[in-house]
């Protein structure tokens, strides 16, 4: 890892072109292919987690092919529109999780208005540019990269055994002044009475969730060419088995990127890629809900009978049967992309680039349901689901066409450097959807749509289209490589708005000062190689709301709108949503000031940024009078602010034969809703209101436990009936009343903001070294501050039909007054006052995770040359190896925490062995 003075001369991919890193005036983060592949992950969202300061990447699920990853750049960008960055793969919008990571050359993250405004109305939430690999002039190189390994859950809660569960229920009943229910049954269990016919001890977790699942990934590529033609071709295959039966995902990818030199001033590019994803999952419920059932159902319920038949579970709901009966949803999603480009350089410094891209995404999902039979106590209990057998067939098609025409002029005049870019882009998208279904399939093996009962047939379809037309420009000027100036602008027109609101102009301006190039800095050059100040301001837009025609009235058809004509009923249509032709773009005014630095011959380098994002004209829907009987229209009304900072630092050096590096970053963002025009967004657990962060946790403020009857008699209690409250129950604070002052009651007036779910102080730390062919790296990622509200089984024992977990036995008793949980109570209807939404159930979601660790060995070339191999590396890697948590619930993961408790697909702890070979 030898350092050179050219480190800062690296070229960075920016919008519609490239720039030298030293000349950047915007906030741009670049990631190379080595950093991407080091983690050995299957999708791009996970590859960026913890690497890019300011980028929040949250993986909410470990489900194969559906990790529900969310990306947010510099905080939340909208209330009702898209909040994800614009992701462009070779200039065309795409899905980060659908691309083979082995084919990626670089990723550039455009964070501020200066770098992103050239993408105008779709860049409000930032832009991620993905550039795939291309061929080079020289002897062809064949590269193979593959690994195989196992996934296991990062963590799972441990449910109680049947005896422990029944003992807990009896204690809860005694606390409620009720007679114990299981005294005699417990004795039967203790004396070996469990026979899985009349008495059950079902380990739902181990019956449904597998201890490990296979994961494998293989990629082979060829790159090379001559002066006149260069080619990069790759093929990839990825497969992941799920942690439950009948759950699997696979992806096959093919790519061909070619560049042809027609003559000295004309170049032709032809790129083609094909990808197909296949997914299988149980059809009777989502995999996450099935796992949730397995983690919450009580052990005394029948799961598997002694003769192998399925138990009755909860009124026929049996997650074991759901995953094992073979009733699955099978989906296929092919993607085809063809891109042709022509580059003309008629004059020195002048380049004209034109491209046409055609992209098609298809989807086909077939789901078949066959009821399973259940038995309990030796008797048949029924078939479930009770609706009988059914089948559905769903088809989607999406076609995107994009035209680009970009002209670039670049020249140097003495100490003056000028680069001007102007362009045009047209894009259109067409989408169709069709689904059909039937019920009552009486014979196995005839799972075709037309074999169902025609009298039960259903069908539905949808269609929408969208188009944009854009004009764009950028001007870069620098003097003596010291004073940098850049102006960007884009003029967008979209089909989502009409009239004068259809078009919007989104400009930005930025400047940089390389102080280290000044004469007065010369004495400090030996210590500080580069020091650059930069600042930017600009306007970005957002038009990506859920509706493709938000300005128009909506028309719906229904028998309820019909009318009788000559004793015959005819269905009708009616307006269902009010129109508003005056709506327009959401706007984001962004300011950024930053510094880039490099010390000690570029061994120590990094950057710092402070930014403010003011989001205005947010799209909302306000209530209309009930007699209107229609959905309210969209309106531009509301504003929000994000402000934060980002810091990154890296040290890389060599000691003897050891090359080593340390890279770290940390960032923070604060969100504040400025103006909602008097509206509040209030759900059961969250509140969005003016002056507070979006989606703040909202509930009562807990004040410990009641310790005595005297304390209860002297305090206000929830509901007002003190006879329903006992020592060991949660005590709530009386903080307000109808007049805004405490009134001696605990009611809805005492609800307030009790936590902030926005992650704060996100960080990443990478350590690595190389020594005589051995390479090692470890990557830590985490969140310094986040509030998580939990309900359901994850927090509340015996709530609803839930079981109790081992860690929940730390409940209040007179002998255990500092317990983690209040006194035990059954709560079949979820009305227990202890289970109110309160700060008691808000826990710290802060964590630090060893996200990835890799140990590899590259064989000496003296050995591999004999086999005509230029490089051979073997490695072992582990992901999510351990997590340090801040008093979080045992068995639950703070990264994919959800407020509903246990209905989630656990994240994966992965162990793989891999091989890299180059010929």
Feature roles, as predicted:
Residues 1-255, 260-263, 267-271, 275, ...:
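Short, small/polar-rich motifs associated with maturation and membrane association
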Residues 10, 36, 84, 251, ...:
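Extracellular/periplasmic, surface-exposed regions of secreted and cell-surface proteins
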Residues 6, 26, 50, 97-105, ...:
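Structured loop/turn residues at beta-strand edges in well-structured enzyme cores
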Residues 2-4, 58, 74, 638, ...:
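A structural detector for beta-sheet-dominated domains
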Residues 98-99, 359, 374:
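Extracytoplasmic assembly/pore-lining segments of large envelope/extracellular complexes
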Residues 180, 188, 195, 369, ...:
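Surface-exposed, extracytoplasmic segments of Gram-negative outer-membrane nutrient-acquisition systems
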């Amino acid at each position: 890892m030898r350092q050179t003075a050219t480190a800062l001369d690296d070229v960075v991919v920016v919008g519609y072109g490239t720039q030298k890193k030293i000349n950047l005036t915007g906030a741009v983060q670049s990631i190379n292919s080595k950093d991407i592949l080091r983690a050995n992950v299957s999708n791009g969202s996970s590859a960026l987690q913890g690497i890019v300061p300011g980028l929040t990447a949250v993986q909410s699920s470990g489900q194969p092919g559906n990790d529900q990853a969310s990306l947010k750049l510099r905080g939340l960008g909208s209330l009702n529109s898209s909040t994800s960055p614009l992701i462009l793969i070779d200039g065309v919008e795409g899905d980060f999780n659908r691309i083979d990571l082995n084919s990626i050359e670089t990723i550039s993250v455009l964070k501020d208005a200066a770098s992103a405004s050239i993408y105008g109305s779709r860049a409000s939430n930032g832009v991620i540019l993905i550039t795939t690999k291309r061929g080079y002039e020289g002897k062809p190189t064949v590269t193979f990269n593959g690994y195989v390994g196992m996934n296991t859950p990062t963590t799972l809660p441990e449910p109680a055994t049947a005896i422990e569960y029944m003992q807990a229920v009896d204690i809860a009943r005694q606390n409620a002044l009720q007679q114990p229910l299981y005294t005699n049954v417990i004795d039967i269990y203790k004396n070996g009475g469990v026979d899985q016919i009349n008495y059950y001890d079902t380990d739902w977790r181990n019956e449904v969730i597998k201890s490990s699942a296979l994961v494998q990934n293989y990629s082979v590529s060829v790159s090379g060419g001559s002066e006149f033609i260069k080619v990069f071709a790759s093929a990839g295959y990825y497969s992941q088995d799920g942690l439950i039966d009948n759950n699997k995902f696979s992806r096959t990818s093919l790519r061909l990127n070619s560049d042809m030199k027609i003559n000295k001033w004309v170049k032709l590019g032809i790129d083609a890629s094909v990808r197909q994803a296949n997914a299988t999952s149980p059809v009777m419920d989502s995999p996450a809900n099935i796992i949730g059932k397995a983690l919450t159902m009580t052990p005394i319920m029948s799961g598997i009978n002694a003769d192998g038949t399925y138990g009755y579970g909860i009124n026929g709901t049996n997650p074991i049967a759901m995953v094992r009966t073979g009733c699955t949803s099978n989906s296929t999603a092919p993607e085809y992309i063809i891109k042709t480009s022509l580059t003309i350089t008629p004059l020195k410094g002048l380049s004209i680039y034109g491209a046409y891209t055609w992209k098609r995404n298809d989807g086909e999902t077939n789901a078949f349901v066959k009821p399973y039979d259940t038995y309990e106590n030796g008797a048949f209990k029924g078939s479930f689901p009770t609706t009988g057998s059914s089948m559905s067939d769903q088809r989607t098609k999406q076609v995107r066409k994009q035209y680009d025409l970009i002209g670039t002029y670049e020249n140097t005049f003495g100490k003056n450097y000028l680069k001007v870019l102007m362009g045009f882009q047209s894009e259109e998208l067409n989408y169709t959807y069709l689904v059909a279904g039937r019920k009552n399939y009486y014979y196995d093996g005839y799972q075709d749509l037309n074999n169902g009962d025609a009298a039960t047939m259903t069908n539905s379809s949808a269609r929408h289209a969208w188009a944009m037309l854009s004009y764009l420009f950028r001007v870069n000027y620098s003097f003596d490589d010291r004073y940098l100036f850049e102006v960007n602008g884009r003029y967008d027109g979209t089909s989502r708005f009409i009239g004068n609101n259809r078009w919007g102009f989104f400009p930005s301006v930025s400047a940089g000062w390389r102080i280290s190039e000044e004469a007065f800095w010369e004495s400090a050059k030996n210590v500080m190689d580069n020091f650059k100040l930069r600042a930017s301001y600009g306007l970005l837009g957002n038009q990506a709301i859920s509706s493709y025609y938000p300005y128009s009235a909506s028309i719906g058809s229904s028998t309820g709108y019909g009318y009788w004509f000559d004793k015959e009923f005819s269905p009708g249509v009616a307006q269902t949503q009010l129109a508003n032709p005056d709506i327009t773009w959401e706007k984001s005014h962004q300011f950024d000031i930053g510094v880039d630095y490099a010390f000690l011959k570029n061994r120590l380098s990094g950057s710092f940024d402070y930014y403010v994002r003011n989001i205005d004209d947010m799209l909302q829907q306000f209530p209309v009078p009930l007699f209107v009987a229609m959905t309210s229209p969209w309106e531009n009304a509301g504003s929000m602010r994000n402000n934060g900072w980002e810091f990154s630092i890296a040290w890389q050096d060599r000691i003897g034969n050891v090359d080593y590096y340390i890279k770290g970053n940390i960032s923070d963002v604060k969100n504040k809703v400025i103006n909602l025009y008097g509206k509040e967004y209030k759900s059961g657990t969250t509140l969005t209101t003016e002056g507070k962060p979006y989606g703040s946790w909202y509930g009562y403020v807990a004040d410990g436990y009641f310790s005595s009857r005297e304390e209860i008699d002297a305090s206000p209690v929830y509901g007002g009936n003190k006879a329903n409250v006992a020592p060991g129950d949660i005590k709530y604070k009386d903080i307000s009343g109808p007049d805004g002052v405490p009134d001696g009651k605990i009611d809805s007036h005492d609800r307030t903001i009790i936590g902030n779910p926005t992650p704060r102080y996100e960080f990443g730390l990478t350590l690595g070294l190389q020594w005589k062919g051995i390479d090692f790296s470890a990557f830590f990622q985490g969140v310094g501050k986040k509030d998580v509200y939990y309900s359901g089984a994850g927090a509340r024992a015996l709530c609803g039909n839930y079981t109790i977990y081992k860690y929940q036995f730390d409940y209040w008793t007179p002998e255990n007054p500092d317990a983690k949980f209040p006194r035990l109570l059954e709560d079949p209807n979820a009305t227990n006052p202890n289970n109110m939404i309160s700060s008691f159930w808000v826990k710290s979601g802060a964590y630090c995770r060893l996200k990835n660790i890799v140990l590899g060995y590259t064989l000496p070339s003296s050995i591999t040359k004999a086999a005509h191999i230029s490089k051979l590396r073997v490695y072992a890697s582990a992901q999510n190896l351990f997590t340090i948590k801040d008093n979080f619930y045992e068995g639950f993961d703070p990264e994919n925490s959800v407020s509903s408790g246990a209905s989630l697909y656990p994240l994966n702890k992965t162990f793989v062995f891999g091989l890299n070979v180059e010929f």
